[in-house]
């Protein structure tokens, strides 16, 4: 777009700054797992990001392994039972896809029957990230930085 609008130098500088932020935030593999879950709408069941798509890359750059990495699909319908089987060390909970706040997303997730049996939940290892953190935008870079900071042990 920088070429189209004759702002290449500004666009290139902004892209370089984002690249530097990603490089600065990127962390080596931690050996920890995570499930990045979300609700697509107020009526839809729990969903998760699979191994395809930007969310999987953000988890990997944060040094985490997605418990749904084997699925090449980017978007999955999941159940609490599936989470219990996969035992993620961290829960990354996306919010805001349909206008819900972080607090509303957390309350909805914690109200799911059986979720209290997840070790990540009982240990308080839930990271809330805005919906934009899983899409190609500068918000994804901020989401990576927030995720790395929140999952530092």
Where are these regions (language model features)?
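Structured C-terminal subdomain patch of bacterial secreted/periplasmic proteins
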Residues: 3-6, 90-153
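Extracellular/periplasmic catalytic domains that process cell-envelope and extracellular macromolecules
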Residues: 28-30, 84-86, 119-122
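Solvent-exposed loop/turn segments at secondary-structure junctions
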Residues: 39-45, 73-75, 96-100, 132-135
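Second-shell loop/turn segments in exported
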Residues: 1-13, 42-49, 69, 130-137
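Basic- and aromatic-lined ligand-binding clefts that recognize polyanionic substrates
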Residues: 9-62
């Amino acid at each position: 777009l920088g070429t189209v609008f004759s702002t290449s130098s500004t666009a290139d500088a902004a892209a370089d700054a984002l690249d530097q932020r990603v490089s600065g935030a990127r962390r080596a593999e931690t050996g920890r797992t995570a499930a990045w879950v979300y609700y697509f709408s107020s009526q839809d069941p729990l969903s998760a990001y699979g191994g395809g798509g930007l969310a999987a890359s953000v988890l990997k750059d944060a040094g985490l392994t997605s418990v749904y990495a084997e699925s090449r699909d980017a978007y999955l319908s999941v159940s609490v039972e599936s989470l219990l089987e996969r035992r993620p060390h961290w829960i990354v909970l996306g919010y805001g896809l349909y206008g819900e706040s972080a607090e509303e997303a957390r309350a909805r997730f914690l109200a799911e029957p059986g979720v209290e049996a997840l070790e990540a939940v009982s240990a308080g290892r839930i990271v809330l990230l805005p919906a934009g953190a899983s899409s190609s935008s500068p918000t994804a870079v901020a989401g990576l930085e927030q995720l790395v900071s929140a999952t530092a042990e």
